[in-house]
Amino acid sequence: MDGDYSERLSQENERYQDGESCILESASAFAHRVLEEIEALAGTTSCKAVQLVRLKKWAQDQGCWYDDRSQFGDFFDRGSENEVYLSLDQNEIIKLNDFRYSDDNLTSFFERIKAHNKYFPDCAYRMTGLAENRDGKVCAVLVQPFISDARLATEEEIHDEFIRLGFRPEDNGEFYTNGQHDIFDAVDGNVLVDDEGHLFFIDTIIYESGTGGIDTYNSLSPRANSKGKKQ
């Protein structure tokens, strides 16, 4: 990709702040059109692989495909779905999300990111493009602020914050719901607290309520599978 990474982030942030059509919305709309095409032609909504191929070409055509991962900064961590980098200025976390928790199409991914930004605006995601991770998988490039000088939240703090936000625990606290969205994986390693007591939900899994999210999560999550083996 042409241009300096920090310059692209700055430009994308300006577009985001100005309320213009951001990459997240554009990519979501494009993926939805692919879904509609496949459903009309083949009568199925199982089209994740096709969507990823088409999204890569779309990103290349739109100038938001990253060829060089070194632009993201220093490799930081690898989770179940994210390859994580710390930006060169150490102000942002860049996640290459491989769409693991989208089952047969990408609809739930885009719904999830939009829901995250609604509930947790202090650590909202910006989608700045797409790239391949170290395993060669097509990924969304997601940018979050880096939360420095923070500690891990306790289970009680996480519970209290969800109650404050209008959520209730389900399945013995395995996830929280407000009837519109179900939020999984809000455990201490994914929720931080700053020195003023503010909680930051930096990495959760969200599904629209009533769409079988718990089954999808349990089938795809290493954490859930690990619990199942111990029982």
Name each model feature, range by range:
Residues 86-87, 146, 193:
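Conserved hydrophobic "DFG−1" position in protein kinase catalytic cores
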Residues 93-100, 145-147, 203-205:
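Active-site ExK catalytic segment of metal-dependent nucleases
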Residues 101-111, 152-157, 210-213:
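Active-site-adjacent loop/helix micro-motif of nuclease/hydrolase catalytic cores
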Residues 176-231:
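Catalytic activation segment of kinase domains across protein kinase-like and atypical kinase folds
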